[in-house]
């Protein structure tokens, strides 16, 4: 009888679903000012006996549980963006010199090409974290109520924002590590010797370029601050940390500081580009540089966020999310549905 009870308790434990994250709560019915703490249920009724297979999933449940279901969409999108960016960068950095001047730059693939893919994927995924919030606000303004359900694709997208953010942080950390490895590369040392030799041949005593120095100092500093804020967002998404925060504190960190990190990342990319926007040589085979494509979606998100932050729209959105309904728009939708 005891072994049967243990098996039953194990099945109950594996069938139970963990509590959702704070940002996955019913965002349509929760006020931002709520400060109540969410507690995990404590399973006191489970029989705690030591067994060798205590943490093994029962065989009948192994094929019924999905593997990381909320990570499927973010990983697929990240893989698609990374693959397309890699092929695009490979075409510009390696294939073009080989086809035009027969120069082989395949050594750039492991570090230089990959390090142009990583920031592109990171900032795009970070923009995809806050884009559904913009779309949801526009939908609520259009409907005039918060009680009408969002489309299924938007609802699914909003529930995977945490995963998009964690993947963005992962690619940002990789980008920082790859960037720090630049001076350790053998090819960089050879280039440094070549630059020194060319400076001697040109009789230049000083190779200091003022605007280039300022450019690098600024964009590196902004990149460090942006990565630090992303790290803070990643830490607060850990369940043990988020449980210690009120909903208002968690919402403030994830929404306000998240937009700040997106803004810093966008400025980081723009300052990295500096005067390359008007350089004809950057448009290889009439294709724009990678940084131009990378900042497009973040700029769109920031512009719409700024528009929705205007007092006339902000007040109406807050009223709708606190339960107010626009009767005129609701009546129009009811009449259209009846027709």
From Swiss-Prot:
Protein residues bound to FAD: 140, 161, 237, 254
Residues engaged in binding heme b: 175, 268
GO cellular component terms, A-Z: cell-cell junction; endosome; endosome membrane; membrane; plasma membrane
Tissue: Ubiquitously expressed. Highly expressed in prostate tumors.
InterPro entries xref list: Fe3_Rdtase_TM_dom, STEAP_metalloreductase
Residue span, Ferric oxidoreductase domain: 118-265
Cofactors required: FAD; heme b
Entry's localization field: Endosome membrane; Cell membrane
Pfam families: Ferric_reduct
Protein's UniProt keywords contain Membrane: yes
Membrane topology summary: Multi-pass membrane protein
PANTHER family hit by this protein: DUDULIN-RELATED (PTHR14239), METALLOREDUCTASE STEAP1-RELATED (PTHR14239:SF3)
Family according to the record: Belongs to the STEAP family.
Assembly and oligomerization: Homotrimer.
Name listed for the protein in its UniProt record: STEAP1 protein
Taxonomic source organism: Homo sapiens
């Amino acid at each position: 009888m005891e072994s049967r009870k243990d098996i039953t308790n194990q099945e109950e434990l594996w069938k139970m679903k963990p509590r959702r994250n704070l940002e996955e709560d019913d965002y349509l019915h929760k006020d931002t000012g709520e400060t109540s703490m969410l507690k995990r249920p404590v399973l006191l009724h489970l029989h705690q006996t030591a067994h060798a297979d205590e943490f093994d999933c029962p065989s009948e449940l192994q094929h019924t549980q999905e593997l990381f279901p909320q990570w499927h969409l973010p990983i697929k999108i990240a893989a698609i963006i990374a693959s397309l960016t890699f092929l695009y960068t490979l075409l510009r950095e390696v294939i073009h010199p080989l086809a035009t001047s027969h120069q082989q730059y395949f050594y750039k693939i492991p570090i230089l090409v990959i390090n142009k893919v990583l920031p592109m994927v990171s900032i795009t995924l970070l923009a995809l974290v806050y884009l559904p919030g913009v779309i949801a606000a526009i939908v609520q303004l259009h409907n005039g109520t918060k009680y009408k359900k969002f489309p299924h694709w938007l609802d699914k997208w909003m529930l995977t924002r945490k995963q998009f953010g964690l993947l963005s942080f992962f690619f940002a950390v990789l980008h920082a590590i790859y960037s720090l490895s630049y001076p350790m590369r053998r090819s960089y040392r050879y280039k440094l010797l070549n630059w020194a030799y060319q400076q001697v041949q040109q009789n230049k005593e000083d190779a200091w370029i003022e605007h280039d120095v300022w450019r690098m100092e600024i964009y590196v500093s902004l990149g460090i601050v942006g990565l630090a804020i992303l790290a803070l967002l990643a830490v607060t998404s850990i369940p043990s940390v988020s449980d210690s925060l009120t909903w208002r504190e968690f919402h403030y960190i994830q929404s306000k500081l998240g937009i700040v990190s997106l803004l810093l990342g966008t400025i980081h990319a723009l300052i990295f580009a500096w005067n390359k926007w008007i350089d004809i040589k950057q448009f290889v085979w009439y294709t724009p540089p990678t940084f131009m494509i990378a900042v497009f979606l973040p700029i769109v998100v920031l512009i719409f966020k700024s528009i929705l932050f205007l007092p006339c729209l902000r007040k109406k959105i807050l009223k709708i999310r606190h339960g107010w309904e626009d009767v005129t728009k609701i009546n129009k939708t009811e009449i259209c549905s009846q027709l």
